[in-house]
Amino acid sequence: MGRSQEHGEHPSRVGEGDEEKIQPEIQKHISRSDKHDSEKGLGDEQGPGNGQYAQIDPAVASRIAENVDDFMTLVNEADDANERERDMKLSHAFKVYPKAIGWSMLLSSCIIMEGFGTSIVGSYISFPPFRDKFGTQAPNGDYQIPASWQNGIAGATNVGEIIGLQIAGVLSERWGYRWTIISALVAVTGFIFFPFFANSLTIFLVGELFQGMAWGIFQTMTVAYAAEVCPVPLRHYLTSYVNLCWIIGQFISAGVLVGLEGRQDEWGYKIPFSLQWVWPIPIAIGTYLAPESPWWCVRHDYKERAEKSLKRLARSSGFSQRDADAAMALMVYTDEMEKQISEGTKYWDCFRGTDLRRTEIVCFIWLAQTMSGTAIGGLSSYFYQQAGISDADSFKLNWGQNGLNAVGTIASWFILNKAGRKTLVLWGMIVMFILLLITGFMGIHDPPSTAEAWTAGTMVILLSATSNFSIGPVVYTIVSEIPSTRLRAKSIILARNAYNAINIAFINIVSYRQINPAEWNWGPKAAFFWAGTNIIFTAWIFFRLPETKGRTYAELDILFENKVPARKFASTQVETLLRGTESAQKEQVDLITSNDARKES
């Protein structure tokens, strides 16, 4: 059933004798487009041929017209919604969409729980009560968790996340984002029992494998939901807020460990795990009450449900029925367009046609986050200790580091809208490269002096803060914006799995051995290795990462379909509907008119 029929309207079907009825409507829309061109300072010389102007393929527009009722009404309403969203002021977005902000932040709080849990596991290798319980004595007399077990536990978490991500792809397709998250919250409540009651590293490892499965579901669903419930002006705030949720969880974890650092009995490490039971029930209740993503509803042809979700996400005083109709039209139009230009909605389709380029971008940008040097920051407490800083001071530094990370993410919100995604990421990578070099030079003397150890520790704090000002939060925005809406969840899953796979290979195996005194014992010199990987991915970002700031999803579809080079994404003028040069307009008119006429013949 077409959307006009859903609203009780009679679709205007075009028969063979009615071409003159649709021609004026198309020409009227083209006139609107020409007027918009003149306002933007565009002329016919800026057509798609010279790379400054991208538009929908006329054949694609024609096929969309075949699949929907009352095509011209759909086009006009979608055009209104596209311009409204693209030109919306931030203050207006905050005024109209406070509910969308609230629901998105609520579901993203799953990541606070995950950040707390993963940080606890990462910090336990340097936490005295845990080391004394499960560790073996190192040559220097201290108890250490063997590198093989460090790798195994961290690797089990990543493997669990990979499994969970795949489960998320299947469940979200059938149940939607909300029920997939709720099922993971129920599961993780039971999985916490494993590490809490563990009396050996084997049971602890199994527990982290199972917890990782639930965490993998959260990683995808929260980002996808945030990207689909808010308009363009709010998109980077709510998607990058996911990174802040990680930091909040890590900050709470660091504070708990500082408070328990002097406790030597088994409750010194059991209390942090027991605190994980605080999160699931209230988050599950809130998730149950939240509206489903309207984009998910449109993709599954639940259009009435999608409209209800739209209205629940916006304040009624600023979101009229006309606004809802226009927003629905844009979602339906975008979905129909993606059906025509994409191969399908299976995982394999992420590697076909223009979606291959999009998959490359989301995977590599998440790999860049890992390979930028943040591995050292992620093992900060352990790194500080091996650099010569006391246990107590190392945990305090880690706590302060997480506080600065939060400040960095919040500060990025004020820059991101002006600087753009690519600029902020690129300069962040360059600054991190310099900080890594300084850190490495502090480890040339073995052992480093007190001043060198503290300098290296300071550089790691600045490194982590820089990451969380740039690539840390921005990567969540990029991976949610780049994929097509029909493949968003699967693309994020593939990207996060690439991230987890590289973590297993480099972070869980290489980084632990680099720092562990019983293994390679590089100390601060490990930063030289990460400086090398940083510069490789900095080059990729410069040449391959496009700028997506201020683009609607329909506009991004057109840019990728037109194969616009990454360096021209920001400057290319895009029209998602009927627009372009005079010849292109005529071609669109002819195709759509003939197809509409053919429907009734």
Question: Model-derived features: where do they sit?
Answer:
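Transmembrane-helix signature of 12-pass secondary carriers
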Residues: 2-311, 338-601
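Short intracellular "coupling" helices and adjacent cytoplasmic loop segments at the cytosolic face
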Residues: 313-326
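Cytosol/matrix-facing amphipathic helices and coiled-coil assembly/linker segments
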Residues: 324-337
